[in-house]
């Protein structure tokens, strides 16, 4: 069976790779045609050897870069929408470049036709071109791997079609790489401003290169270069910050900024959860703190984990009193139900949570975490209760009725959420919240979940689990810290009140 399963996985992998290669051919061909349309007039005459050789080299270069990154990419990157987005951003970058070329030529002609006391060159004004805008956009909505692919394709295009201006190629690849490294974590719109400033700072060494390569050294030329660099950084900031929300919407991308915007009490679901199920809301808040701290240690996305924690139990809104954290000393409605019916109600909060999330159009990554946060785990309390009720016919108890439908966690973030969910609830039930008690329970619960195979389909390693355990202990010890008992001096209190 294991051999058959491995063969199926290999076949699926080969199929995915073949589809990706086909997409790469189409992508490379369309990009080459786009470049020819804007940078050269296409002539299909049989004697135009330069055209054929240039197009062939450009196509093969783009396809080679694409192929290299496809081989090193993970499955979630190999989506058609990603390459459509990259093509659109390349198209936008070309339009912006042509527009700035037009402005530059017009400005140079104006300066030359009038006596302003100084001259401008196209090289100096090149620093004002927002060549890194595309890299900023791709990094914002995708990841560093896809952004790097874009940078090298875009730089290769500039290198082929602007052979006489090697300076533009060097500036394009340098500013784009600086832009990518500046927006690794986009958690506020201010990160684009920082990227713009970094790009502007890059203009200083390029300004020196321009001056050293010129025949005469004039201070005003240096100032023009610096000013052009500042404008270039400003243009990158304005264009990227303005277009990122549009790309998010068109491609349905889930960025940290989008997650931060929905993970507040302003969202109707969280507002209703905090009012209707305050116990569940408190549990979710603590989980968010636990998951966020642990995620940073294992290379997961802390913003996604925190947002997933806030929304993971929204399905409990519909039947709040059937969950113990919301009962607050009132009668337990499960006392009047059979174990199988109780398990059905408990399980239903996952399905209802997914339906509510879809109704409010939550990001797909958050919906996946709602589905996966219990995996296929067993609802032990009611399963054991059913076994006790059927002592003589224990084999008649169907275990599947007491298991969540799954799927198991498919990502590090979902795995961390599952661990935080189980551990927070268990620690809350401890009679004494000492550090030793918390530490023992955290390790016990992680070992139990791991042994049950619930983490088999996510990327968490044993080393990751060790780090997560330490982080959970630290966070929970801080939350449930012990305090000294204050002396109840009633007389002092009365005197204070009467004064």
Q: At which residue positions do the language-model features occur?
A:
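Extended, domain-scale alpha-helical bundle/helix-rich regions
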Residues: 1-67, 433, 446
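Juxtamembrane inter-helical linkers in multi-pass membrane proteins
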Residues: 3, 114-115, 253-271, 313
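Short helix-perturbing small/polar motifs within transmembrane alpha-helices
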Residues: 13-19, 34-40, 60-107, 134-144, ...
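Structural signature of hydrophobic alpha-helical transmembrane segments
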Residues: 48-60, 113-128, 163-172
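Juxtamembrane or sensor-core-proximal signal-transducing alpha helices
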Residues: 65, 69, 210-215, 237-260
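Structural signal for the N-terminal portions of transmembrane helices
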Residues: 196, 217-235, 305
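Alpha-helical membrane-embedded segments
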Residues: 203-204, 224-249
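Divalent metal-dependent catalytic cores for phosphoryl transfer on phosphate-bearing substrates
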Residues: 265-434, 448-452
């Amino acid at each position: 069976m294991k051999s058959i399963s491995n063969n199926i996985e290999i076949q699926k992998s080969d199929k995915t790779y073949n589809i990706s290669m086909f997409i790469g051919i189409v992508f490379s061909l369309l990009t080459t045609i786009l470049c020819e349309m804007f940078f050269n007039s296409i002539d299909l005459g049989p004697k135009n050897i330069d055209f054929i050789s240039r197009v062939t080299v450009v196509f093969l270069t783009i396809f080679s870069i694409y192929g290299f990154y496809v081989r090193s990419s993970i499955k979630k990157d190999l989506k058609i929408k990603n390459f459509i987005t990259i093509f659109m951003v390349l198209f936008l970058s070309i339009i912006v470049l042509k527009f700035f070329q037009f402005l530059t030529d017009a400005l140079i002609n104006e300066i030359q036709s009038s006596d302003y006391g100084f001259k401008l060159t196209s090289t100096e004004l090149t620093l004002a071109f927002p060549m890194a805008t595309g890299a900023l956009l791709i990094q914002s909505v995708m990841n560093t791997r896809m952004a790097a692919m874009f940078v090298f394709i875009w730089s290769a295009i500039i290198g082929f079609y602007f052979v006489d201006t090697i300076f533009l190629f060097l500036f394009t690849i340098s500013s784009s790489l600086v832009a990518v490294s500046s927006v690794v974590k986009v958690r506020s719109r201010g990160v684009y401003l920082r990227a713009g400033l970094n790009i502007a700072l890059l203009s200083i060494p390029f300004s020196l290169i321009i001056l050293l390569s010129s025949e005469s050294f004039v201070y005003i030329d240096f100032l023009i270069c610096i000013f052009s660099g500042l404008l270039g950084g400003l243009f990158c900031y304005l264009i990227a910050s303005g277009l990122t929300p549009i790309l998010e919407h068109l491609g349905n991308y889930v960025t940290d900024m989008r997650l931060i915007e929905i993970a507040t009490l302003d969202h109707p679901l969280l507002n209703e959860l905090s009012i209707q199920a305050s116990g569940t809301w408190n549990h979710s808040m603590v989980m968010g703190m636990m998951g966020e701290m642990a995620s940073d240690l294992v290379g997961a996305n802390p913003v996604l984990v925190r947002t997933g924690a806030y929304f993971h139990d929204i399905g409990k809104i519909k039947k709040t009193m059937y969950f113990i954290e919301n009962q607050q000393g009132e009668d337990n409605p499960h006392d009047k139900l059979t174990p199988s019916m109780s398990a059905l109600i408990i399980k239903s909060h996952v399905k209802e949570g997914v339906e509510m999330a879809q109704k409010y159009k939550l990001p797909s990554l958050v919906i996946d975490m709602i589905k996966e946060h219990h995996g296929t785990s067993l609802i032990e309390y009611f399963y054991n209760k059913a076994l006790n009720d059927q002592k003589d016919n224990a084999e008649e108890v169907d275990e599947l009725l007491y298991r969540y439908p799954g799927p198991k966690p498919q990502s590090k973030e979902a795995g961390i959420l599952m661990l935080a969910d189980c551990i927070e609830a268990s620690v809350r039930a401890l009679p004494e919240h000492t550090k030793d008690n918390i530490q023992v329970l955290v390790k016990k619960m992680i070992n139990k979940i791991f042994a049950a195979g619930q983490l088999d389909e996510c990327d968490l390693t044993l080393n990751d689990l060790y780090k997560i355990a330490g982080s959970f202990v630290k966070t929970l010890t801080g939350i449930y810290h012990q305090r000294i008992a204050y002396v109840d001096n009633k007389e002092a209190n009365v005197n204070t009140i009467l004064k």
